[in-house]
Amino acid sequence: MRLRISEAVVLFLLGAVAALIGDHSHVVTGTTVYHTDAVPFVWSSPFWFPILVGAATASLAELRLHLPAPRDGVTARQALGGVAAVVGTYVTTALVHAFPVVPVTALVCAAAAITWCVLGDGPGAACGVVIAVIGPAVEIALVQLGVFAYHPDSDGLFGVAPFLAPLYFAFGVVAALLGELAVARRPQLGPPVCDTVSRGPGAG
């Protein structure tokens, strides 16, 4: 494991909080409806939802550190911008869920592309692709199990919203960047100090 436990916990909590904000936006606007009350809820979400997203955040960050050439020049400012971009896009999907599917999906694709162009790299895109496949697949399975449903105007991808793929892609790019930042901010050990004294010619 490349992440330290403390770093993984921070990333888990960050992902969980962002998930709660986005999911609350989906629930209050009717983008999604949960059909279960058998488990405790945290705000508007069943307790397992922020756990899944938090775990995905830490896992994607860890994955990035196993891919080639993690960047050591990423900054907290970039990370803040990335998190804001993903949460903002997530909330935007809640506000436009009833609009025609093509412009909504194109809008989210554009936001995801900009996020990658500004903040990502090749391995970060790979992380984005991984979660862009896994995330919607998990949601499709949960919809088929009757756990929740998307609004009829937003369920064109096997029962889930087509905008999920680019939204998850942006999430993967930013989670990868967060992993790079976690390593880049670790205290750097300086070069060893030589404690020998140079002696002039003929010195005893």
From Swiss-Prot:
Q: What is the lineage of its organism?
A: Bacteria, Bacillati, Actinomycetota, Actinomycetes, Mycobacteriales
**What family does the entry list?**
Belongs to the INSIG family.
- Give the transmembrane ranges: 5-27, 47-64, 76-97, 101-118, 124-145, 162-179
Record has Transmembrane helix as a keyword: yes
Which domain of life does the protein's organism represent? Bacteria
**Subunit relationships:** Homotrimer.
Principal subcellular localization = membrane
Instruction: Give the residues the record marks as binding a 1,2-diacyl-sn-glycerol.
Output: 26, 150
Q: What is this protein called?
A: INSIG protein homolog
Which keywords does this Swiss-Prot/TrEMBL entry list?
Lipid-binding, Membrane, Transmembrane, Transmembrane helix
State its location(s): Membrane
